[in-house]
Structures are given as C-alpha cells and as structure tokens.
Amino acid sequence: MSDIHEHKILILDFGSQYTQLIARRIREIGVYCELWAWDVTEAQIREFAPNGIILAGGPESVTAENSPRAPEYVFNAGIPVLGICYGMQTMSEQLGGKVIQGVGEGEFGYAQIEMLTKSALFKDIEDAVNSEGKPLLDVWMSHGDKVSAIPEGFVAVAKTDTCPFAAMANEEKRFYGVQFHPEVTHTRQGMRMLSHFALDICGCAANWKPSSIIEDAIERLKKQIGDDEVILGLSGGVDSSVVAMLLHRAIGKKLTCVFVDNGLLRLNEAAQVMEMFGDHFGLNIIHVDAENRFLDAMKGVADPEAKRKIIGRVFVEIFDEESKKCANAKWLAQGTIYPDVIESAGSATGKAHVIKSHHNVGGLPDDMALGLVEPLRELFKDEVRKIGLELGLPYNMLYRHPFPGPGLGVRVLGEVKKEYCDLLRRADAIFIEELHKADLYNKVSQAFTVFLPVRSVGVMGDGRKYDWVVSLRAVETIDFMTAHWAHLPYDFLGRVSNRIINEVDGISRVVYDISGKPPATIEWE
C-alpha cells in the first residue's frame, strides 16, 4: 500500500476566502496537503516535511505595519514555493522586491494576462494568442496592491495592462508568484497550473485518491481501536454515515450505532436509515424512538435558538443514556471533518483568519470517559462524499441537499407540534419529488419547504377551508455564504402548489420565497 501522506504540500493561510479552495484543488490533483496559519514555526514546518509550500491570499496589505509575513524558513528550506495574490506580494517584499498600495486601480474579476516568457508553472498552457503571437490566459483577479519591483533572481512571467508583474518566477530556486487566483474556476487553466506545481515542480506522486484513503483509514482504525468496542451517533447524514461504513469495514460487529429518531426527520427517513444500515449493510444499530420526548421538551417554545438548544440537550441526554448501556464501549466515534479542525486550530498570534464551520457533534458529556475516534478529520466534505460512494453508499443519499441539524425543528416556524411536522413532511416530499421529476433537483443548491403557523382561507369544491400555509424555498449558491433564489419555472411551481394543496389535507396555500442571502438567510430560522 502506497503511503498517502508520503508526498505533501503545506498551505499557509493569510486569511483569504479562497484558502480552503486551494487545499481542495491540491487534493483533487491527488496530493495530500494541510492548511496552517501563516505564523507557524520553523520546527513545525520541518516536522511536517512538505515537498512544497503555497502562500495563500489574504485581505491585508503588505505595505501596512505588522501585516502577516511568511516564516523566513519558507525561503531557506530548499523546496518549491508558490505565492498566490497576497502570497506573491509578501514573497516579493520579503525577498527584496517592492509592493505598492493600490490607489483606485486594483483588478477585481476577470482579466487576461499576457505571457512574457516560458515557465515551468505555465508549461504548455494558453487560452488564446494575441496579434504579436504572445500566449494569453483567462484568469480571476482580486487585488488592490501590486508588486512594483521583483526580487533579484526573478523574471516577469506575465503582465496585464495595469499590473506589470501578474506572475513572476525564480526557476533556479523554484519560487513562483501569481497575482491572480488559480484555484477558482474562473481561471480556466488554474488546475493545470496547480498540477504543474504539485506534481512536476514539487515532484509529488498522486497517491491521494478515494480507494487509498479508505485503505489507510481502515488500517489506522484497526491500530487505534484494537479489540475494543466503539459507539457512534448515526444520524443518517453524510458524515456519520461514512464514519459508520469505515468502522464497519475496520471492526465489524464491535461497532454499535445509536440512531435517535427525534420526530423531526424527513418523510420515511427513519425507516430508510434502519433499512439501509441495519438490513442492507448489517450494522449493529440501537433505534431510539424519541419523538414524544423531543416534542414534549419543545412544548410552548417558539424562539428558534431556544428550540435548537433543547434539541441538542435532549439528544445528548438520550445518547448518554444509551452509551451507558454499551458498558464495553471504549471509544466514541465522531464525524469531525477537516474544516472543523481548521477552525479549532486558530493561530499562534491570534492574527490569522479563522474559518468558521459547523461542528459535527458538540456538547457530549465530559464524564463519558471514552477515547475519540475521528476517521474523517483529514477530509473535506467533497472527499467524504467520494469515499462514501466508494464504500457503497447511494449517490442520492450522499449528494442530497443540506438538512439542518435540528431538522424540522427550525423549518416549522414558532412552536413545533406533531401535526405541523406531519404536514410539512408530506408537503416537502412532494416538492422534492417534483424537482427530481423535472430534472431540477441537481440544478439548485438547496430546496425545502417551510411551515408557517398562519391559517389562510381556501376553496375546496363548494365549501371553504381555513388551513395552514407553507412556503417553498430553493436557492442557488457556490459556498452558502451568499445565495440567489432559484428562478424555477412558473408551470413547475404551479404543479407543486396544486399537488400539495390537493394531496395534503390541512394546507390551503403555497407561497414561494424570493429572498436572496443577504439580506435573508437560507433557512427561515
């Protein structure tokens, strides 16, 4: 078995919104990488022993006092370095070049760079050719400051009309700087540039692939756990499902999964989880039907944050009770993924940008006295999905739209009642079914239905009915930080509305949410 961590790239984070994207791109190329704050020590870099280092972008100005700098060792380690945007600027400044502050002439968005000379980073790459026969590349810029003089030993590799050094290189030392962002899809040949850096310049082998990751994870789990037993909270979501499958492969029946049905899941979801993991894959699952317990705890509570806290508290209570029944369990498995690790790592100086993410599991009792097993802690979400497919989990389950941890608890507005949840489940199932039938499900990023605790008059036959209102919500987004409402066809929306009103007794009106994020959020609560 090849060592999937043998070749690796270190990415230093200076606070760019794109930094995690760089890491994901390097992983997609097949090379392991880690993302650390910019203020790491020489000892930490030596211990990690990377084959190359990428200095990522950042929001600060190299010209400002006390702005972040790469550790000097980065340029003395004898390994290739790629500076991206701010990373190029700090590389230039630290090695004797000059950076000037942008005065109203920064470049933001699409740009075309003209190649001035050949470079290993841009080998055989061009998007077009200008009238002078010079190769042109379509790239994505996002910078105010710019390099005005490059360090000794460097050459200008590319330029734009307003940026004389859009790319620079010291081929002898294998130092490269690009003012644009190769990691974003708008830079058409960005993946090829990153591939040249990781595979050709740094000499990494592409060992980081789903089958190898699974093999490595199973071996490590066997070593860590030995003959002990493990307990896992299985929700049916992507992360816990993939953890369950990895542990099942590694230790078989020594894994006990606790599936808590809180009554806030999607239509037939509890039955589907039990059928898939219990009947089909043969996992050992304790099924706790706790619908009444959750609903009783939320009785009379309308505040969304209070509802979230109650749902979290009751889950912890139940999981604690069930874990005590598994007296032989020595380990607790969690679906922690790499973005969670990045968030909690932070920075030695406190200056580095901290990327926020939602922790998979939190608030479990400190007195559980169990060791922690986190087989996904090196993986991004897209990697978790890929290894889930390799482990035999169905595509439709792994690539479902996001579902909030509190479930329908935050999609029923105000107080949560069983009647409301049942109506919402059925309405939502119709919406999702119709999206699939119209081949629209994978064209939107997230779609769901919200129950509004208001009654509206409707006409059924010769009579009137006074029933509840639901809102359909569908958005398009790249990162869920901002989102546009999806412009679904009117005839499609009409069909969904008619089906819900005719098939779900208790709903008399369907509306469509056309709010973007910002100013609205994607979820209503």
UniProtKB/Swiss-Prot annotation:
ATP binds at S235, G236, G237, V238, D239, S240, S241. It is an enzyme of class 6 (ligase). Coiled coil: none annotated. Gene3D superfamilies: 3.30.300.10, 3.40.50.880, HUPs. GO terms for cellular component: cytosol. Pathway: Purine metabolism; GMP biosynthesis; GMP from XMP (L-Gln route): step 1/1. SUPFAM superfamilies: Adenine nucleotide alpha hydrolases-like (SSF52402), Class I glutamine amidotransferase-like (SSF52317), GMP synthetase C-terminal dimerisation domain (SSF54810). The active site is at C85 (nucleophile), H181, E183. Its EC number is 6.3.5.2. InterPro entries: Class_I_gatase-like, GATASE, GMP_synth_C, GMP_synth_GATase, GMP_synthase, GMPS_ATP_PPase_dom, NAD/GMP_synthase, Rossmann-like_a/b/a_fold. It catalyses: XMP + L-glutamine + ATP + H2O = GMP + L-glutamate + AMP + diphosphate + 2 H(+). CDD domains: GATase1_GMP_Synthase, GMP_synthase_C. Residues 8-207 form the Glutamine amidotransferase type-1 domain. Residues 208-400 form the GMPS ATP-PPase domain. Keywords: ATP-binding, Glutamine amidotransferase, GMP biosynthesis, Ligase, Nucleotide-binding, Purine biosynthesis. GO terms for molecular function: ATP binding; GMP synthase activity. Homodimer. Catalyzes the synthesis of GMP from XMP. HAMAP family: GMP_synthase. This is GMP synthase [glutamine-hydrolyzing]. It comes from Shewanella sp. (strain W3-18-1). The lineage of its organism: Bacteria, Pseudomonadati, Pseudomonadota, Gammaproteobacteria, Alteromonadales.
